[in-house]
């Protein structure tokens, strides 16, 4: 399975577009964060829906909260968190700042629940890591665990 096929499989034909695959690839390269990790966060946060709006004013694909990321958004020139590329850039910039490549479980728990993450955020982190492993397996031509 190639990258576009994976994004389409995960997000469905309507949401898993070539543009989404390209945008994830772009920010993955910019921030040196694995694209399957970003896709896993996108699925976990919004089910790939760029218009997703959570109860805490979390917005877009990666459910970024403007109240907590206003400075980051200003630095990045982000004005619309419902724009997929702007949202991906903001969320991935935060993951990169959390050093997700060094300690994914801890970084993802903070991403989800703040700097003192509750237990549910550790469960979230584990589910993202498991999903990433499954996606990596599909990209490498086999089912995870087979």
Regions found by a protein language model. Give the residues of each.
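Catalytic glycan-binding domains that act on GlcNAc-containing polysaccharides
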Residues: 2-146
């Amino acid at each position: 399975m190639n990258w576009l096929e994976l994004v389409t499989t995960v997000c469905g034909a309507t949401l898993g577009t070539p543009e989404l695959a390209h945008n994830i690839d772009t920010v993955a390269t910019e921030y040196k964060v694995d694209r399957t990790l970003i896709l896993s966060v996108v699925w976990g946060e919004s089910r790939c829906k760029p218009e997703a709006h959570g109860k805490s004013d979390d917005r877009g694909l990666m459910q970024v909260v403007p109240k907590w990321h206003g400075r980051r958004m200003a630095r990045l020139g982000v004005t619309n968190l419902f724009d997929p590329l702007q949202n991906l850039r903001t969320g991935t910039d935060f993951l990169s700042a959390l050093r997700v490549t060094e300690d994914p479980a801890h970084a993802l728990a903070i991403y989800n629940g703040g700097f003192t993450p509750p237990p549910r955020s550790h469960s979230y982190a584990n589910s993202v890591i498991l999903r990433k492993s499954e996606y990596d397996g599909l990209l490498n031509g086999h089912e995870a665990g087979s």
